[in-house]
Amino acid sequence: MTQQAAEVAKRRTFAIISHPDAGKTTITEKLLLMGKAISIAGTVKSRKSDRHATSDWMEMEKQRGISITTSVMQFPYREHMINLLDTPGHEDFSEDTYRTLTAVDSALMVLDGGKGVEPRTIALMDVCRLRDTPIVSFINKLDRDIRDPIELLDEIEAVLKIKAAPITWPIGCYRDFKGVYHLADDYIIVYTAGHGHERTETKIIEKLDSDEARAHLGDEYERFVEQLELVQGACHEFNQQEFIDGQLTPVFFGTALGNFGVDHVLDAVVNWAPKPLARVANERTVEPAEEKFSGFVFKIQANMDPKHRDRIAFMRICSGRYDKGMKMRHVRLGKDVRIGDALTFFSSEREQLEEAYAGDIIGLHNHGTIQIGDTFTEGEALGFTGIPHFAPELFRRVRLKDPLKSKQLRQGLQQLAEEGATQVFFPQRSNDIILGAVGVLQFDVVASRLKEEYKVECAYEPITVWSARWIDCADKKKLEEFENKAVENLAVDGGGHLTYLAPTRVNLALMEERWPDVKFRATREHH
């Protein structure tokens, strides 16, 4: 095996998906603890930056105390290199969250044991399904009252349409939480709470049918054995291929706060989740072990340092290796650039990167030339697919406070749209500018950034738009007919694509019925 193939085989790149407050932040910290990378990485840190600024580097994040931006953390674990991509978990997140899922090979779903499957989890799972991403599940908060575990598994299967295979099974919960039983390997992992940054030594009881197990479970023993028989009869067994195909999820139980069960999940990612996978480009399929470098940009983050109008483009490496100072071709622009200062997202010690391999995420300094979906290679003209725009769910009309600044407004919105902070639509029948977003917070982010970076003050007005759909139609004549009939609701997005702004769900359904030759798409590839 070449050194490069060996490095790729060591990589595991995954994201955590959850509803807000299911415990994602806590589990992220505990995962870093497992990797001993406890210089808790938020985003790229400079040595001088204080801890507070680590992750919440935008003013607004500081005020609200939430992390809007998706950060990347790399840490070693069991001779592997883990790349963990965090996704904003706040009530309001953005398209960034969705797009981050295009850059990973697997995902960890965290559920609150007291609440089960929640709306945000469903939305994120839908995105994972676009690429059949393998999912590992962690049912959290066993140190509190939780719902019946069998009920939780049924809910995962019914709502998320994925088979659930329990790997561990909880023994009690809340004050009676005694640990978990490993179904396949027949041993008990005893619960001892390890708070903060301690890693507690794991105590194991071999075999459920033992005096030690009977003593540990006490009066609960008989009932637990009965419950297990029921579970083993009713639940799916783990199947590696079904997991890789995104059809089955292994389920673990624990408490991130009590630092229990998190290592089981990380072991599952290392043992079962795929190493960096081949990626499909328009021209061909790119294998990770290929010698030549290639990668795509899935996210752009602004102002990591408020003093500079600097933006960092996050790139997933798909093949080859990055070496400091190497020359890359920026395919969309057809230009060669030398990259000497890519950033890595390791602990604070290593901020300038010397080398990186397929599966790793690197940060490129971007002075306005890089867009989401851009491909970088060692010369070959490739364009990776599968980095979509998602139809916004919320819309506002922009009102400018100073009409003389309309040029700055358009310029600012154009850049923020390229970055993925918002989507912008220009209706064909008016001079309005309409913004679309996935979470309300995106509108606040745009307003504050327009003010800080472009000195433009704007306000928002409500507008009757239910959803947006990108229009495709192979038949030119039909398309023309459609455009004439639907002109009141047609707009062009920031990339110049024809978009239908549906005022209501019913209206959209009627239009789709009336115009069978016209495709109304809910996602659009970056080109």
Swiss-Prot record:
For the tr-type G domain, which residue ranges apply?
Answer: 9-277
GO biological process terms, semicolon-separated: regulation of translational termination
- This protein's source sits in the domain of life called Bacteria
Gene Ontology MF terms: GTP binding; GTPase activity; guanosine tetraphosphate binding; translation release factor activity, codon nonspecific; translation release factor activity, codon specific
Tell me which Pfam families the record gives.
EF-G_D2, GTP_EFTU, RF3_C
Q: Is Ligase found in the keyword set? A: no
* Localization in the cell: Cytoplasm
This protein's UniProt keywords: Cytoplasm, GTP-binding, Nucleotide-binding, Protein biosynthesis
- Residues forming coiled coils: none
GO-annotated cellular components: cytosol
- Positions with a binding annotation for GTP: 18-25, 86-90, 140-143
Family membership noted in the UniProt record:
Belongs to the TRAFAC class translation factor GTPase superfamily. Classic translation factor GTPase family. PrfC subfamily.
Which HAMAP family does this UniProt record tie to the protein?
A: Rel_fac_3
Q: Which NCBIfam families match?
A: prfC (TIGR00503), PRK00741.1 (NF001964), small_GTP (TIGR00231)
Task: Report the protein's function.
Answer: Increases the formation of ribosomal termination complexes and stimulates activities of RF-1 and RF-2. It binds guanine nucleotides and has strong preference for UGA stop codons. It may interact directly with the ribosome. The stimulation of RF-1 and RF-2 is significantly reduced by GTP and GDP, but not by GMP.
Matches recorded under PANTHER family: PEPTIDE CHAIN RELEASE FACTOR RF3
Q: Which named protein is this?
A: Peptide chain release factor 3
Q: Which organism is it from?
A: Pseudomonas savastanoi pv. phaseolicola (strain 1448A / Race 6)
